[in-house]
Amino acid sequence: MGLRLLHLNLHGLIRSHDLELGRDSDTGGQTLYVLELVKGLAARPEVEKVELITRLINDRRVSSDYSNPVEKISSCAEIIRLPFGPKRYVRKELLWPYLDDLADRIVQRLQKENKFPDWIHAHYADAGYVGALVSRRLGLPLVFTGHSLGREKLRRLLAAGIDHDQIEQTYSISKRIDAEELALAHSNLLVTSTKQESEEQYARYGRFSSKNVEIIPPGVDLNRFYSAEINSKDEEKELNKLFSPFLRDLNLPPLLAISRAVRRKNIPALIEIYGRSSILQQRHNLILILGCREDSRQLEKQQREVFQQVFELVDKYNLYGKVAFPKQHKREQIPSIYRWAAKRSGLFVNPALTEPFGLTLLEAAACGLPTVTTDDGGPRDILSRCENGLLVDVTDLEAFRDGLETAGSNLSLWKTWSNNGVEGVSRHFSWDAHVCNYIALMQKRLKFLAPRHWTLGNIKETNPIGQKIIFLDLDNYLEQSKSLSKLRNKLENNSLNNDIQLGILTGRSIKAARYRYAETQLPKPSVWVCQAGTEIYYSDENKSDIFWQDSITVDWNRKGVEKVLFDLKDYLELQSSEHQAPYKVSYLLKEPSDAILPLVRKRLRQSGLAASPHLKCHWYLDVVPLRASRAEAIRYLTLRWGLSLEKVLVVASQQGDAELIRGLTKSIIPFDHDSSLDGFRSQQRVFFSEARDGVLDGLKNF
């Protein structure tokens, strides 16, 4: 049997043909890279199947292609579209609340098919989050590529003077960084494009490990991007028609920029330099390919702002007849545009503030078009191998201008750069070489990490009789419930008891939990999830589930946790010994504060500890292994039992119970719940009861 591979690319618009690159800030080079990688892998003889999972979109504003659940790419490659979040197309920052749904759907889909991939490759932070959850639940190796990192984005935006609260509101930057940290913690392999990306960007993350890194530069499709003295007559005619409405002299060497209209690409700075330089205006046209648009007023805010700057700068410097920014172009025209510019001895310009890799640089080089590019990120590696242009500090406008003026002044040097680029891309950056290197490195790295999936053990002794299960919180809901007698009668009803089993969630030990539970006189539970999700017991058994224990205790260091958090003694104090456990360190906050949880999380990450903090009822902080939680324990149980998550009902009432509500499980939230749970009111699977007998009220619809 050949390799089975699963790629996750969740946001943006992706299909097997006619990619809408540059349509918005979410549909950029990452989309092209992922699609080309999937196609390249599918063409390899050692690969049996490649699946690319993305979001199913039903929205009249976008093509119906994106509502097709399964799209064939080739005989052994498919795009699988799964629904999560709104039906309409939304920007990636609005998808965070729904990623747990997708993780649950992927796990259920793989379990149902019983055909597991040899590895998962997650692209970008959102897919990294989902990939980490799927990896931990099914024991599958995870490969992660961040493409563009949250910490780097935050650094640049703060340096630009943007307020942190505004950054958070616009980009959900803390969620993105948290997701990247989670992905890095679970990754068996981190694929980067450049050494700089690894050493200067990923190294800022607490859970980054350099030993997991492999540098595999992306490739270029040399069947599309190649050097030629002239385009076909039809191509030449089409491009002349595209640019002639803007340019007085089509034969001037162009300065060509191709990017999305987003701030990071720094296009206004390029226009500013061009507008200030009489030499550049005399010698060159400026051509800006910034995606396609119908009406710039209808674009998303960031794109509108960039185009407004473009229009204003062209007007400010009276650049009419010298600057082209066509509204529409076809993706298949891009190689011809590079060749059109190269024929006129032009330059490709990348003014981005940072460039994780720079695929357009390779495309231009393959077409014989030299470059002047940002010195931040991937371009360093590309130019060190191809020697086909200049690196410049794009934040220094004078240095940037000097670089452009110098690069365009020497035709002999231009020819050398042109030839070097064509040869360098062919030697170092072909897709064949990329895919071959990718598979070889994966197999070498992951051959000792065969998918383990969950070992079922003696499932007959642990499988509940009923087809559904309800989880109650012993420490909060049952402590405070005034309706125990009614609940007891309901659960003791024979017709109900044959259908619904009972599970108990608690931070207590199994001994203390059973002692307290006996006072409720409720029916015997089928399962106990104890010590904040770190221990699982079945019925009357006194020995915890060893399979669960083995899966969560990877790299656990209890003493390390206590040592790292000791210097937070002004905010935290260890609880007494009866509240501690081998895989749980329990603290009491001296004063409730929303700042404590992020602070503890940061300290644990910075120390490289595989641990996760959970705050309950605003006062009680438990630090447990990274792979452990009450929600993860429930998912482990459903996998062992073969029970659909839709058949699980969880009662959530307190601060800290949000983890129980996310995903495909159903939830009841009683009327006297903590206000921190109100944000889930829009969730279809969450029932907010207005009755005092909240659980009984919710059970009517379960």
Show which residues each predicted segment covers:
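Substrate-recognition "cap/lid" segment bordering the active-site pocket of phosphatases
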Residues: 531, 537-546, 550-551, 612-645
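Substrate-recognition/cap helix-loop segment adjacent to the acidic, metal-dependent catalytic center
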Residues: 508-527, 591-612
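Mg2+-dependent phosphoryl-transfer enzymes with acidic/Ser/Thr/Gly-rich catalytic loops
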Residues: 624, 631-702
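Short beta-strand scaffold positions
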Residues: 122, 144, 192-193, 373, ...
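Asp-based phosphoryl-transfer active-site loop
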Residues: 465-483, 661
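Active-site phosphate-binding/coordination module
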Residues: 486-577
